[in-house]
Amino acid sequence: MSDEKKCPVTGRTSSQVAGSGTSNKDWWPNQLNLNILHQHSAKSDPMGKDFNYAEEFKKLDLEALKKDLFELMTDSQDWWPADYGHYGPFFIRMAWHSAGTYRIGDGRGGAGSGSQRLAPLNSWPDNVNLDKARRLLWPIKKKYGRKISWADLMIFAGNCAIESMGLKPFGFAGGREDIWEPEEDIYWGDEDTWLGDTRYSGDRKLDNPLAAVQMGLIYVNPEGPNGDPNAVASGKDVRETFARMAMNDEETVALVAGGHTFGKCHGAGDAANVGPDPEGAPIEQQGLGWKSKFGSGKGGDTISSGIEGAWTPTPIKWDNSYFDTLFGYEWNLEKSPAGAWQWHPSDPEAKKAVPDAHDPSKTHPPMMTTADLSLRMDPIYAPIAKRFHENPEEFADAFARAWFKLTHRDMGPRARYLGSMVPDEELIWQDPVPAVDHELIDNTEIADLKAKILASGLSISKLVSAAWASASTYRDSDKRGGSNGARIRLAPQKDWYVNQPLQLPELLNKLEEIQQHFNSKSGNKKVSLADLIVLGGCAAVEQGAKNAGFDVTVPFTPGRTDASQEQTDVHSFAVLEPAADGFRNYQKVKYSVTPEELLVDKAQLMTLTAPEMTVLIGGMRVLDANFDGSKHGVFTDKPGSLNNDFFSNLLDMDTVWTSTSEDAELFEGRDRESGELKWSATRIDLIFGANSQLRAIAEVYGCEDSGEKFVNDFISAWDKVMNLGIF
């Protein structure tokens, strides 16, 4: 290589820069990915550590922002003209595709972080040309700056779009904070080509936790399963996909019909004319992708999904014309100019029904996608669609509510909602808990209650396990779960196998006795069972530390309340049941991924760092908090004592480990010289000695002088977990 091609400073070739070259992942593809525990650090956030988005949002004049957005709707720009002179449908699609990545399986995806701005979502095939929607919003974002995040602005723009076209939204809540780097924890599928669908196995069984049918799609393939224009089969895909996004059949029909009341699809020409996506586009395009060589590349020449046309004759007006069109014609299968399957009315007069989006001298027939026709052909969807057709007000309310759910589902409880447009109505999918209506216990009463709990006969193991079971349901992905509400005493959580439903009532009954005795006293000072469950765990941790020679106080903040069964959607909460909980050495069945990968996944959902995950495992083991009393990983002869024995014994070179199961998931540790059996372990336990990064952390806690640090770090991580979901 000539000198001209080398860096003039270092003499290196252009490929020899920091971060390049063969990576650890290249050498060891199956290496445990701990990077997902350390995403979104302050080093990537330009806003600074003192920035408080909630406080900034309170300064926002939401009505002024709404006025500016309404004006933008009809301010068509030559560089990207508005269809029908109105950007409303475009912004609805942007907001929908921001929120529509949410899936209930792990709570990941959704609109809560503004991730549509970043790879891979900014370049998904289903998001073609939404980069222009965000650029249209830039002048408004520029004006309001830090007072509104991109995440909130995209959703609010969708709300304003709906209202500007004639339907009052159910409400809007702010509070979504932007991220500044792509989310590495989200499993979008393992396909290596856009629109690949190896996520299916057997009889079209979709891989969990995925919801979309193909890589790079938000929902279903609008042309039908794998492009097969079969409306009945498409209905099955629609049902599964929307169900995995927390929508029932009525909500699904309302969303599809309501969303497709507005706007049009774009498939004016061959997709081969379209250039690379934003991430692959040349630098001079400044983050805009999909530059098209077809005609003007915009307006009437736009190519996006490949499907071409509008659903209704009134694409920028809220009305019932979607159902009028769906049920008013018989439909013929045809191909768009881009070669995509779509349906047109058999009636030739329909060719005059829809105005052109840019040329008033032209008209077109309405179109339906195969997915649209599933609302007419599916035996469950069809009666719902007909009822909505006959009852426009019911349809309008159903769509407004479903849209609110779609765009707010991943925000968690109402306590996180910000702004003057938050609806008053409490909704079951928000996982409501009662407001605090009593005086909270003080430090003296906390100490007294701790003593009563420890004197009740409940063991350290049981108290720690119960508190963990209550709090560790939290997942930060959609801000659900946690100790608030004490739902461990309600269906479905009380019956989860991991919570040992045969033993759980004894503990809950004793805590309820203590609660009732305390609350029967005069005055307005009360304690909830939710608080007592956590307090019991804290008392047990304190006792464990005392047993190890450390006199500590575990932090405790009261204020949790007890939810009722009526406030708890059993079906909705079922998805929070842990398939595995490595902190309790529990795994329901054998999975295709390793137990240690499942541990890291759960730790990420609980916002734990690698050091926090490590110290919690070590503490939970010596506190004897394993599922069903298992002794795997209890590397101590003093269970119930919060010491660093787990680490010192794991790192002991006098122990030799061998697998005792064909799948290498259970192990025994024997004395290197005598062969005497010392310990048993799972992969979860041994990964802290096998993985180089985790071993480095384990060595910190395995040192002879680390006892106090271990206790303090465990308490800090424990307190963090106990307060997850408290907003």
Swiss-Prot record:
SUPFAM superfamilies: Heme-dependent peroxidases. Residues 11-26 have a biased composition (Polar residues). It catalyses: H2O2 + AH2 = A + 2 H2O; 2 H2O2 = O2 + 2 H2O. InterPro entries: Catalase_peroxidase, Haem_peroxidase, Haem_peroxidase_sf, Peroxidases_AS, Peroxidases_heam-ligand_BS. Residues 346-362 have a biased composition (Basic and acidic residues). GO terms for biological process: cellular response to hydrogen peroxide; hydrogen peroxide catabolic process. The record marks R93 as: Transition state stabilizer. Homodimer or homotetramer. PANTHER family: CATALASE-PEROXIDASE (PTHR30555:SF0), HYDROPEROXIDASE I, BIFUNCTIONAL CATALASE-PEROXIDASE (PTHR30555). HAMAP family: Catal_peroxid. Belongs to the peroxidase family. Peroxidase/catalase subfamily. This is Catalase-peroxidase. It comes from Maridesulfovibrio salexigens (strain ATCC 14822 / DSM 2638 / NCIMB 8403 / VKM B-1763). The gene is katG.
